[in-house]
């Protein structure tokens, strides 16, 4: 971050740090990046720094996080924020917060500190197929809702070359899919696991990581 003046400026002004833990992203010049679970812009900042020509479509349903995201990317015409969650069906749903407002999920925790009504819809309600220009990257980090979010992307998954998704080895929330579930779904959609990144530990053991998937027959 210290070597990138724009990222340092964002940190000093907004206290938002780019997701530098994602070190294994494919070496491609992405034209389109879809950031589902954008929060305050950590991953989108990394993308803007690494792929400055990419158009970023970010999705963040939590109003406080979306407001911060807008201030971080104010004036950037290549970053488009959609204040919504991606889900298989359209409608209003509940975002559960089990602590600080950076930990929201559409899956209910054991005890929710706060419940927020949010808009949810499939990706196709926000983007047309021709808006996803190749090479294209899809990123999902939605606190246990990744499987349902992928179902919400189903009609447009063929437009993506690569997918980055958080994978869990242990269940944090009731009904949360584990790594094997997501790997199987993406395999059925024509993607192969090609890399691991951003490891998280619990009690000294790896509990989660980001899986990097590439299409077996790239769209680019």
Predicted regions and their residues:
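Phosphate/nucleotide-binding beta-alpha loop and adjacent structural elements of enzyme active sites
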Residues: 1-220
